[in-house]
Structures are given as C-alpha cells and as structure tokens.
C-alpha cells in the first residue's frame, strides 16, 4: 500500500489555492492535473501490487 503523506498533500493543495487567489487559473488547473496524475499513479501501483498472484506459502 502506498504511503501518502497527508502533510505534503495539504501543502500542495495550499499552493494551488495560493495560485488561485493570485488569479492564475491556468497554472492552478495544471498543478491540480499533475497532482491528480500522481495520485492515480499511486493508486494504480497499489492495485497492481494487490493483484499479484500469491506464492503457494502465502495462500
């Protein structure tokens, strides 16, 4: 299972909010898209690890 650092995630969301307050909507959306892609990649890695066949001694 991936280890999502809640503090780091909150900092990144805060950065996006600061960008929105500054009025740079394009950059804020771009940053959110990057964050979303990273989180989806983490989720895909988790799903891939969970779907690996177990060794006979793990069943």
UniProtKB/Swiss-Prot annotation:
Domain of life according to the entry: Bacteria
Pfam families, per database record: YciZ
Family named by the database record: Belongs to the UPF0509 family.
NCBIfam families named in the record: PRK13658.1 (NF010179)
Name of this chain's protein: UPF0509 protein KPN78578_12530
Organism: Klebsiella pneumoniae subsp. pneumoniae (strain ATCC 700721 / MGH 78578)
